[in-house]
């Protein structure tokens, strides 16, 4: 499924069901609500979009997630996430508020390249804490602006 050049009020699990790949390209998206969607089996690709409200607490992107050249306006709370069989790629995007990764277990690689985190992220922060993120296949972090090793738990 490809949605291109659209204004989308809300995208949730019901919209993604039955698709192996779901692409959002050049869209204005008010809300992506995937809170508590364990084992999301779609490869979600978001490119050149503006997202007002990205809600992904407890979402497992089993078949991968790609966010490229996208602006995310809200604070993102990604707890108990990861569990990805395919890579999670975040590239060339701008996050206007804090992006909190909390107790995520990444089974495949996560890539952060050429992003701007205006208020930072704790992806590789919280060292030694019981809720520190884990990376079974490692991570690739390159050329990001903003602190990526914040040692904070909540949304700043």
Task: Locate predicted features.
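Tandem repeat scaffolds
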Residues: 2-156
């Amino acid at each position: 499924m490809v949605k291109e050049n659209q204004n989308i009020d809300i995208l949730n699990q019901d919209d993604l069901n039955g698709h192996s790949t779901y692409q959002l390209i050049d869209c204005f998206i008010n809300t992506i609500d995937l809170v508590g969607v364990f084992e999301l089996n779609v490869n979600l690709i978001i490119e050149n979009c503006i997202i007002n409200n990205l809600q992904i607490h407890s979402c497992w992107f089993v078949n991968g997630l790609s966010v490229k050249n996208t602006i995310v306006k809200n604070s993102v709370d990604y707890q108990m996430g990861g569990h990805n069989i395919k890579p999670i790629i975040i590239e060339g995007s701008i996050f206007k508020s804090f992006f909190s990764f909390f107790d995520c277990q990444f089974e495949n690689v996560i890539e952060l390249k050429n992003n701007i985190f205006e208020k930072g992220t704790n992806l590789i922060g919280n060292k030694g804490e019981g809720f520190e993120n884990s990376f079974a296949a490692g991570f690739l972090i390159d050329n990001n602006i903003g602190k990526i090793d914040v040692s904070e738990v909540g949304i700043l």
